[in-house]
């Protein structure tokens, strides 16, 4: 219809806009040929995707699809980013085409849109700077107390253990804080969020802002979807969900004894993710992608750390201390980040609407002062995934309306205790391993 599916970067001045069907749009979903739809407007992002500030992968995951809800969720200043879309506009959907693709529930999408508008009008996307300043303050205080303790009381086993625990706590809390700035949920201006994000993740944690952005936004865009969510790419060490184990079993893939994965998870999951895998991946990505600014921020962390601890522990002792700190931090990070997603539905792309997709892949953990602090408010993972730019101190305010909307449309809204959420990680790994073994032996 109309444009006949001919790709171009923009329409000719003065010409009437070309019109397309959903079928035509869906044909443009390959790596080098990508169209998407936002508010019924059709955009050709084939060339521009490589310049997308959030990374080419995250926007490419919506090629051939309606990206309206994702576009709204990720960008706090829609008017600002609209100017980047204008040169990419190639037409619009035909009047006979529905606003939603793939038979999505229009009533559900409209109800969620209304909920978001209500939250915006009530100021729930406005941050309280003091909240984040206090979180930064308690991180810096923990680091200062850890250093003062070993400087004043020496480097005995007890002092060293307490120092490592305090440093690991500071690192974990800095991880939650960088998450806030990375999601542009603190300052009104994105540039300030980016600047402080570099400081927190780079100077306070020794990691890369670009690496985190490109990886984490994919997870939010397509949570628990194979080949799109990097958080479920387990490099064949684990099989997840109910589909992948059967696939591996039928194909007789046995790179690991997956029926025992719920046991060896304790050996290679929490202990090694940050000290080994993340450090290797960070260094590789920063060098291969030439993230030189990120590398400078990262090196500033280690320079500061060595200046503080080499005088009391020596070079070797300081290295041992930071490795042990990363070991402790890694346990904290893995259990908290996996409890909301790993036990949920994990599958291939099924093109759900935003609300349904996020709820299938996400659960909450009960609210308490400890749970809020311990998880960086990721116990409200459902609300965070629905509204990634909402400041975390407002999650609890939108919970009743999200639950009511889910109840209205019969979408399960899961809330667990913290021990139950942790136990479900192991339970889901055990269940997936058993599915693999059954398929491996009998199919």
From Swiss-Prot:
<dbReference type="GO" id="GO:0016020">
    <property type="term" value="C:membrane"/>
</dbReference>
<dbReference type="GO" id="GO:0006636">
    <property type="term" value="P:unsaturated fatty acid biosynthetic process"/>
</dbReference>
<keyword id="KW-0275">Fatty acid biosynthesis</keyword>
<dbReference type="GO" id="GO:0016213">
    <property type="term" value="F:acyl-CoA 6-desaturase activity"/>
</dbReference>
<dbReference type="InterPro" id="IPR036400">
    <property type="entry name" value="Cyt_B5-like_heme/steroid_sf"/>
</dbReference>
<keyword id="KW-0276">Fatty acid metabolism</keyword>
<dbReference type="Pfam" id="PF00173">
    <property type="entry name" value="Cyt-b5"/>
</dbReference>
<feature type="transmembrane region" description="Helical">
    <location>
        <begin position="151"/>
        <end position="171"/>
    </location>
</feature>
<dbReference type="InterPro" id="IPR012171">
    <property type="entry name" value="Fatty_acid_desaturase"/>
</dbReference>
<comment type="pathway">
    <text>Lipid metabolism; polyunsaturated fatty acid biosynthesis.</text>
</comment>
<feature type="transmembrane region" description="Helical">
    <location>
        <begin position="267"/>
        <end position="287"/>
    </location>
</feature>
<keyword id="KW-0812">Transmembrane</keyword>
<comment type="function">
    <text>Fatty acid desaturase with bifunctional delta-5 and delta-6 activities. Component of a lipid metabolic pathway that catalyzes the biosynthesis of polyunsaturated fatty acids (PUFA) with preference toward n-3 substrates and Delta(6)function.</text>
</comment>
<keyword id="KW-0443">Lipid metabolism</keyword>
<feature type="transmembrane region" description="Helical">
    <location>
        <begin position="130"/>
        <end position="150"/>
    </location>
</feature>
<keyword id="KW-0444">Lipid biosynthesis</keyword>
<protein>
    <recommendedName>
        <fullName>Acyl-CoA Delta-6 desaturase</fullName>
        <ecNumber>1.14.19.3</ecNumber>
        <ecNumber>1.14.19.44</ecNumber>
    </recommendedName>
</protein>
<keyword id="KW-0472">Membrane</keyword>
<keyword id="KW-0560">Oxidoreductase</keyword>
<feature type="domain" description="Cytochrome b5 heme-binding">
    <location>
        <begin position="17"/>
        <end position="94"/>
    </location>
</feature>
<feature type="transmembrane region" description="Helical">
    <location>
        <begin position="305"/>
        <end position="325"/>
    </location>
</feature>
<keyword id="KW-1133">Transmembrane helix</keyword>
<dbReference type="GO" id="GO:0062076">
    <property type="term" value="F:acyl-CoA (8-3)-desaturase activity"/>
</dbReference>
<comment type="similarity">
    <text>Belongs to the fatty acid desaturase type 1 family.</text>
</comment>
<dbReference type="InterPro" id="IPR001199">
    <property type="entry name" value="Cyt_B5-like_heme/steroid-bd"/>
</dbReference>
<dbReference type="InterPro" id="IPR005804">
    <property type="entry name" value="FA_desaturase_dom"/>
</dbReference>
<dbReference type="Pfam" id="PF00487">
    <property type="entry name" value="FA_desaturase"/>
</dbReference>
